[in-house]
Amino acid sequence: DIAKKLGVRVIHEPNNLGLSAAILHSAIAAKEMGFERLCIIPADLAAPLRSDLSAMLKSDSAVTICPSSDLGTNALVVSPPDIIPFRYGSRSSLSHLQEAKKKGINARVMKLDSFTFDIDTNKCLARAMRVVPDIAGVCA
């Protein structure tokens, strides 16, 4: 209901086949709806800044990757939406970069401070709370 009020279109995943498959499903749906670009931001980012998001969206590369501190993919912009296979998992930013290279695409890697911290474990949360003190108030 909240999404509908904000004009967000929800794309339901028909099967629970993992993150990469879910994003591929959404990419295909986005392309069918006429979208030329897709921005993927996982929900576990600690504190993404609007300025970093804006910088990432201004990239004119067909593939823009924002790696996490452990080389995962914390944000990905692709144009068209299905330009590369999605390879989420351990060190996925390197996998996405490799997929772009296989297709002859010069991908852009953007190391944006607010996109480096995700919350995968209690250790990640503790680190994020030290680096971004405002998170502590939200988590209390």
List each language-model region with its residue ranges.
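Short, high-confidence coil segments that cap the C-terminus of an alpha-helix
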Residues: 35, 60-61, 105
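Conserved donor-nucleotide/metal-binding helix-loop-beta segment in metal-dependent transferases, i.e.
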Residues: 48-71
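Conserved nucleotide-sugar donor-binding
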Residues: 71-84, 97-98, 122
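Conserved alpha/beta core of the MobA/IspD/sugar-nucleotide pyrophosphorylase nucleotidyltransferase superfamily
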Residues: 91-94, 98-140
